[in-house]
Swiss-Prot record:
Forms a stable energy-coupling factor (ECF) transporter complex composed of 2 membrane-embedded substrate-binding proteins (S component), 2 ATP-binding proteins (A component) and 2 transmembrane proteins (T component). Keywords: ATP-binding, Cell membrane, Membrane, Nucleotide-binding, Translocase, Transport. Residues 2-237 form the ABC transporter domain. It comes from Moorella thermoacetica (strain ATCC 39073 / JCM 9320). It is found in: Cell membrane. Its main location: membrane. Its EC number is 7.-.-.-. Belongs to the ABC transporter superfamily. Energy-coupling factor EcfA family. ATP-binding (A) component of a common energy-coupling factor (ECF) ABC-transporter complex. Unlike classic ABC transporters this ECF transporter provides the energy necessary to transport a number of different substrates. This is Energy-coupling factor transporter ATP-binding protein EcfA. One of its GO terms (cellular component) is ATP-binding cassette (ABC) transporter complex. InterPro entries: AAA+_ATPase, ABC_transporter-like_ATP-bd, ABC_transporter-like_CS, ABC_transpr_CbiO/EcfA_su, ECF_ABC_transporter_ATP-bd, EcfA_1, P-loop_NTPase. It is a peripheral membrane protein.
């Protein structure tokens, strides 16, 4: 479990807390989405999770290890993998396979173990046929999948995606999200999704809204998505699917469920059409 206890963070040169008195527990295997407007503190919170930033007050514990303990940082950063918005900042080698192997080589693992992990990681993101390709020749979506493979090769227990799909087109964005959800199901990795896209956030088990460096709301996305006042107060909008479902109801179409994604809306409409 990742436990954040009374964490406050102030950036150097500032007097205004970027995060203030944050208390949060992230369970192994869960899918947590953290959203909020720009400047709300969500990316700062992401960087606390593996010790890239350390709280000015309070503490962050990863499976009982304190991120303030220098001797625990290497282990913590292996447990909590991070994928950022711009994949080019995480790609360092001449070929796809070498890039995935880079972090493993720094751990001093045997060559056979490195080869095994690289192969498994590339297969898990669908890049096994591109192992010898230079990273700069990949598309944006492929680069992000490569960055993800490099993190997965380290065998993390928690995977933090910090706006990792923000620079991708809708098709590539959906591919990345689907792969991450599949990995969670197959390997039990906890997913912490930092996003400003409500369409992504509502797919999580639990959603947390940040506002002005504090936790403004947390709970079930399905519960939140039909409370427009909470969303408006946080500077967020209804996801497109939920807005469409609302319009359909206002037009007299009685849906049996409250869909939060395209697949759920399609099923609800199919059931409605089948009854008629």
């Amino acid at each position: 479990m990742i436990a954040i206890q009374g964490a406050t963070y102030i950036y150097p040169g500032s007097t205004v807390p970027a995060l203030e008195k944050i208390d949060l527990a992230i369970e192994p295997g869960e899918f947590l989405a953290i959203t909020g407007p720009n400047g709300s503190g969500k990316s700062t919170l992401a960087r606390l999770l593996n010790g890239l930033l350390r709280p000015r007050q309070g503490r962050v514990l990863v499976d009982g290890m304190d991120t303030g303990d220098d001797t625990a940082l290497i282990t913590i950063r292996r447990r909590v993998g991070m994928v950022f918005q711009d994949p080019d900042n995480q790609l360092v080698a001449a070929t796809v396979a070498e890039d995935v192997a880079f972090g493993l080589e720094n751990l001093g693992l045997p060559p056979a173990e490195i080869e095994k992990r690289v192969d498994l990681a590339l297969r898990s993101v669908g890049l096994e046929d591109l192992a010898a390709r230079p990273p700069h020749l990949l598309s944006g979506g492929q680069k992000q999948r490569l960055a993800l493979a490099g993190v997965l090769a380290m065998e993390p227990r928690y995977l933090v995606l910090d706006e990792a799909t923000a620079m991708l087109d809708p098709v590539a964005r959906e591919e990345i999200l689907e792969q991450v959800l599949r990995l969670r199901q197959e390997q039990g990795i906890a997913i912490i999704l930092i996003t400003h896209l409500m369409e992504e956030a509502v797919r999580a088990d639990r959603m947390l809204i940040m506002k002005s460096g504090r936790i403004f709301w947390q709970g079930s996305p399905r519960e939140l998505s039909y409370q427009e006042r909470i969303l408006a107060a946080a500077g967020l909008r209804l996801p497109a699917v939920i807005a469409l479902a609302k319009s359909l109801r206002q037009g007299g179409i009685k849906l049996a469920t409250n869909p939060v994604c395209v697949e759920e809306l399609a099923r609800a409409l199919w059931k409605l059409a089948s009854r008629e």
